[in-house]
């Protein structure tokens, strides 16, 4: 990434690198979805469920920006593929939570473990702890700004 000498040039270079990262992330997700034989929406929902350690259908719908009816279809497909299951919510047995399965973890591990290993090795080699803190703060800030603009474009359902 070329870096200019003034702050505006540096911000422009960061935005360019961030956009490239987003494009690569989408390309990787496309390939991962294909490898798992799911569509991108289903993969997105799997990532939400896995990252949150299980969610209700309503919470998944809200975070994914889908209707509860659409989430029912997603979860049905993920159950058929063996990647997710519905379980009673321990806090309220009238509700159902969606969790990922061991089959999903095994399948996902083949895709993401090598990536995670490279990230850990290369980032530790290239950056100091303080630099990693700064990068994490940058990503937190961009995530916050992006969430704000997601709501501006289309309020959560």
Residue ranges and their predicted role:
Residues 1-36, 81:
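N-terminal leader segment of winged-helix/HTH proteins
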Residues 18-28, 64, 107, 111-123, ...:
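Alpha-helical linker/hinge and terminal dimerization helices associated
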Residues 28-67:
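N-terminal helix-turn-helix DNA-binding core of bacterial DNA-binding proteins
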Residues 1-5, 130-157:
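C-terminal regulatory/oligomerization modules of transcriptional regulators
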Residues 53-96:
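Canonical helix-turn-helix DNA-binding module
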Residues 79-133:
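Charged, amphipathic alpha-helical coiled-coil/dimerization segments
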Residues 5, 9-12, 36, 40, ...:
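Residues at secondary-structure transition points
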């Amino acid at each position: 990434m070329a870096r200019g000498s003034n702050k505006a040039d540096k911000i422009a270079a960061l935005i360019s690198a961030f956009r490239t990262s987003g494009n690569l992330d989408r390309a990787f997700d496309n390939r991962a979805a294909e490898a798992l034989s799911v569509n991108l929406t289903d993969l997105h929902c799997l990532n939400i469920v896995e990252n949150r350690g299980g969610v209700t259908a309503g919470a998944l719908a809200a975070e994914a920006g889908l209707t509860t009816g659409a989430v029912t279809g997603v979860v049905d497909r993920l159950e058929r593929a063996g990647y997710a299951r519905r379980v009673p919510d321990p806090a309220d047995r009238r509700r159902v939570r969606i969790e990922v399965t061991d089959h999903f973890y095994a399948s996902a591990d083949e895709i993401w473990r090598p990536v995670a290993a490279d990230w850990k090795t290369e980032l530790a080699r290239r950056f100091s702890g303080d630099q990693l803190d700064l990068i994490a703060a940058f990503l937190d800030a961009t995530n916050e700004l992006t969430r704000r603009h997601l709501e501006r474009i289309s309020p959560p359902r």
